[in-house]
Amino acid sequence: MEYKDTLLMPKTDFPMRGNLPNKEPEWQAKWEEEKLYEKIQEKNAGRPTYILHDGPPYANGELHMGHALNKTIKDIIVRYKSMAGFSSPYVPGWDTHGLPIETAIAKKGVKRKEMSIAEFRKLCAEYAMTQVDGQRTGFKRLGINGDWENPYITLLPEYEAEQIKVFGEMAKKGYIYKGKKPVYWSPSSESALAEAEIEYQDKTSASIFVAFKVTDGKGVLDEGTNIVIWTTTPWTIPANMGITVNPDLDYVVIESAGEKYVVAEALLPSLREKLGFEDATVVKTVRGSELDRVVTKHPFYDRDSLVMNGEHATAEAGTGAVHTAPGHGEDDFLIGKKYDLEVLAPLDDRGVFTEEAPGFEGVFYDTANKMVTEKLEEVGALLKMEFITHSYPHDWRTKKPVIFRATAQWFASIDAFRDDLLAAVKGVNWTPAWGETRLFNMVRDRGDWVISRQRAWGVPLPIFYAENGEAIITDETINHISELFREHGSNVWFERDVKDLLPAGFTHPGSPNGEFTKETDIMDVWFDSGSSHQAVLNARPELSRPADLYMEGSDQYRGWFNSSLTTAVAITGEAPYRNVLSHGFALDGEGRKMSKSLGNTLLPGKVIKQLGADIVRLWVASVDYQADVRVSDEILKQVSEVYRKIRNTMRFLLGNINDFHPTTNAVSYENLREVDKYMMIKLNDLVKNVKDSYEAFEFSAIYHQINNFCTVELSQFYMDFAKDVVYIEAADSHDRRAMQTVFYEAVVTLTKLLAPILPHTTEEVWNSLIGEGVESIHLQDLPEVKVLADSEEITAKWDAFMQIRDNVQKALEFARNEKLIGKSMLAKVTLYVDGEAKTLFDSLEGDFAQLFIVSDFELVEGLENAPESAFKSNQVAVQITVAEGETCERCRVVKKDVGVNPKHPTLCGRCADIVVKHYEA
């Protein structure tokens, strides 16, 4: 007889290697074929809903790790909710209008000016849809489960129709107006930009101090006195209309080299050295309020510059006197309006000076900086020039600097409902908590929202103009345009004449001849995505507004979170979301931003081809995503190692229950041994902790909880000593079936708990566990937390035992290093105990030699009896010696009773009994 044939060795079809790049697409094809997404919705029909609303990624370019991070977090949440008693449909979306697509089309050699706007827009739409298709394939390969056949796309007619309604509703409430005021203007995009489209980068600029000569001192200043201003935008001097001083600051008139100058008193010490005023004497001190309406002369144009009082002039930097160009700054515009100054912005859309700036016509504004400073020097007005590096606004698409430029634009008034917006922010649950403060301050401090764009690819502003110039936005026109867009798409605006866009028989008192024109500007793309609560949540029967969760990157506080809040509060009076969760950015292994120029980009598509989607997903679960996260080949290697541990744990569990049938072989909890109960309690604790972590969106906690359970509780303890039972004992022995019961519960529980994170691997485990033709793991519910008898008492006892076991393991390790023993199975452990430890061992049930994975064990009372050579800790002393007896050929345990059965001279008594009873014919 071959004794190895009497061992019950593990058997499973679950392979050690995942081969994920090849296996995952097979599972995905199966899910698609079986309509798994639809089945999940059917299973959960009638349950409470949990709606995570997808913030639409921009349909341009290859997916990056930020996309993978974002979509995987969403997918984990939706999968969790779908297994936790909720109906949680997921409708993915795309943002498809805007400049990057126009630019991409231009790069293909398309000449926009050589075709009609409608033709150009068709090319943009085609390009956007190919990008959507490419990204959709990438997201599906990542294992994202959703309604991929019916996503929402901002260029679709039904979406645009609802967006028009949002605009119409805001206009009806008086929130939409046209005005000329300074807005962020991007010469590189030739369009106005909203605050959300601005990013700050360092820029080197000329910093200049300029003298304006007083022509009318109003009895406070002598004629010819110089008021000194400071600016870092010399190109705005041609548009200067005034100087602002703070009414509550003290200003000094100083005399230096026969000239008088005015600066803020608080800044004089720093200016003495900077402007060469070391020897200057103070002639008089005046209050800023006394300088109100003093008149100075523009340095090189024949016009006045009026001195005004404004709070934005401070003594923090410069001179305390602020150069004011109402056409090129928000504060300047507001103070200019108060003092009735002209709003001069002598630049065209490309940032080139017009004839309104004599001497600089046809010059790009940035190039004009040098010309302006030379002109100031020529007329003797330039006191000082130096260069500084400062944070400056840039166009987030083109990465080029932007300017403030007054133009006629359409705005959404924020003041009209700012208090409602702030109240709505307070009513939302924010994770991380600082998100509330961030958005609250943003809403509190923001100006009106410029919603018009001077571009072609976007949703047209549905505005008509009468013959007298009056803008027409009525219920009748809005509803008509909305339905036209629903039927034909927004291109109809550019394809048809005005008369064919207006409702039949439309009249207006401002057009006695029945003539009308239409607006040519389009809407800000943030108005597009910001209308999704209306176009998607409100419009789709399976969804609802407000959503339970918006979850995006932390850049969306100024973007989608903000624009969605604005439009939703404007038309419904409440936020479109109950909870907002934000994540950080994906950086490289050294914490640097990924960029092609640095050569440090890691693309999810490439990682999936090499390692599999489940590795990318496990990486997402491993990081603290609420801050910026790091990813590199090395980090993914570490994650792959954890994946391997989890997979091997599953394989061991599956292999050792191949002859176990839960309906017939399971041992009830009350009939388990205490150590088995301990594992069931630990497993139950894991269920509670993991579910709590899912509920709190703390996926890295789950990663550590499950990894620790697989490594510490299972691999290093329970599965380790189990081999002496499940391989060796008779197939139906109580102890073996008890351990198999725990194994079965563990594999079922772990598979369900991991399903939202590792959908492909858990499906493979489930298939191996339950067999072919089984319902997907993703149609199961998560395990319930059970109430297990005596759990606190059992846990306390066995946790204490595990601490002592750690000491025994250390002693065995020491003995191995000292060459006292080879394998631990050759050892005998003698444990010297006192007090609590003695009481503990008296109360424990178990085969301690088996639990310590040694051949013999002896418990001795009295620490004082331990020999000097014993390994001592605070509670116990451990003596390691070589076990007496022979090694059993079958179980490899050293036993004194090897050969007790003469028919089986190489077997111990236990193994001989098993062989005789179960394997001898």
Swiss-Prot record:
The lineage of its organism: Bacteria, Bacillati, Bacillota, Bacilli, Bacillales. HAMAP family: Ile_tRNA_synth_type1. Its cofactor is Zn(2+). Zn(2+) binds at residues 888, 891, 908, 911. It comes from Listeria monocytogenes serotype 4a (strain HCC23). Monomer. This is Isoleucine--tRNA ligase. The keyword Magnesium does not apply. A motif ('HIGH' region) lies at residues 57-67. The gene is ileS. Binds 1 zinc ion per subunit. NCBIfam families: ileS. Its main location: cytoplasm. One of its GO terms (cellular component) is cytosol. A motif ('KMSKS' region) lies at residues 593-597. It catalyses: tRNA(Ile) + L-isoleucine + ATP = L-isoleucyl-tRNA(Ile) + AMP + diphosphate.
